[in-house]
Design a protein with these regions (language model features):
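Acidic, metal-coordinating catalytic segment for phosphate/diphosphate chemistry
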Residues: 1-32
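The catalytic Nudix box helix
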Residues: 43, 60-93
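A structural signal for short, well-ordered beta-strand segments
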Residues: 33, 61, 92, 113-115
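Nudix hydrolase/Nudix homology domain
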Residues: 17-19, 55, 96-98, 102, ...
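A glycine-rich, hydrophobic loop/mini-helix early in the fold
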Residues: 30-61
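Short, catalytically relevant binding-site loops at active-site mouths
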Residues: 48-50, 64, 97-100
Length: 176
């Protein structure tokens, strides 16, 4: 795994190998996308081959931008690469930061640009099996309840998003 992502080293942003970032728990840039259909959100189950949190459910797309890559461009690129989703224009909702142990001695310490995209009707999906094992649409209220009942089935960042950033991500939907 030689991909370099933007991470802070000694207070300066620098390109650092992705695995090194997680082993050292470095603060780094990330992107998360939530594709919505009304009050339903598309979630993905991470492939078993992923180097951390394999088999756990996460939001639609969660990734790291390449060094020098715009967060919005990254969101569009990874929706296509992970799920085969094209033609969406994700809307930036805000920035959050979290730190979480993701197992295996790895730490996610992310500064995350959050995006949402609304769709109506069906959405053509073509998941990359090296990234995604399964997908499903879930009502955000049911998802929050499932995460509360079965937290071990979900990634730490999805649990954090739903617990601490529901209003930022889902806005008026979270207040219904």
């Amino acid at each position: 795994m030689t991909e370099k992502i933007p991470a802070w080293v000694d207070g300066e942003l620098a390109p650092v190998g992705k695995l090194d970032v997680h082993q050292r728990g470095l603060r780094h840039k990330a992107v998360s996308v939530f594709v919505m259909r009304g009050t339903d959100v598309l979630i993905q189950q991470r492939a078993l081959s992923k180097y951390h949190t394999p088999g756990l459910w996460a939001n639609t797309c969660c990734t790291h931008p390449r060094w020098g890559e715009d967060a919005g461009v990254c969101a569009v690129r990874r929706l296509d690469e992970e799920l085969g989703i094209t033609g969406l224009a994700p809307v930036w909702k805000g920035r959050v930061e979290y730190r979480a142990d993701v197992g295996g001695g790895l730490i996610e310490h992310e500064v995350v640009e959050i995006f949402t995209a609304q769709v109506s009707g069906s959405l053509g999906l073509d998941p990359d099996p090296s990234e995604v094992m399964a997908t499903k649409w879930v009502d955000i209220y049911e998802l929050a309840a499932r995460v509360t009942r079965h937290p071990a089935e979900f990634t730490p960042w999805l649990r954090i998003y739903l617990d601490q950033h529901l209003d930022l991500i889902f806005g008026d939907l979270a207040r219904v």
